[in-house]
C-alpha cells in the first residue's frame, strides 16, 4: 500500500485530474482504512495512527499531516534489534534499498526515505510547523496510553505512556 501511495501521490498532486492516480490512491486507502490488513494479527504493527489520533483530536490538523510528522519519529524511537528486521524488509521491499547494505544502514535509510517522501509532498515535518507546542504533550500521551491500547504485549512493539511522550517531544 505504501509503495502504491508513494508512486501515485506525486502524480495526483502534479495532475489532480489524473483518474488512474486517484483510483490507485483510493484503492490503497480503502485497504489502509478498513482494518483488513490486521485481520488475524491482533493490533496493528503501525501504532503511530493511535498517536496521531490524539493530535487531530486536540488540534485542527489532518490525519495525513499528523502521520507525516509522527511516523519518522516513531520509527526512530522503536528502532532496535527486535524491530530491525521489519524496517529492513520495509526498506528493501517498499523503498528499493539494496539488501546488500548492513541491516542498520538499511533501517536508517528506510526512516530517512519515509521522511524525505513526506517532505517532497510539502508535508509538515514537526509539530511546531502545525502550531503545536509542548503545552499539551503529556496530556495527549496520557490520552493515547489510556485509549489506544498501544502497550498491549501482542503489539509489534508495545508503547508505554513514557514512550508516547518521548515520540511527541521528538516531533516538536
Which residue stretches match the model-derived regions?
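C-terminal charged capping/lid subdomain of soluble metabolic enzymes
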Residues: 94-172
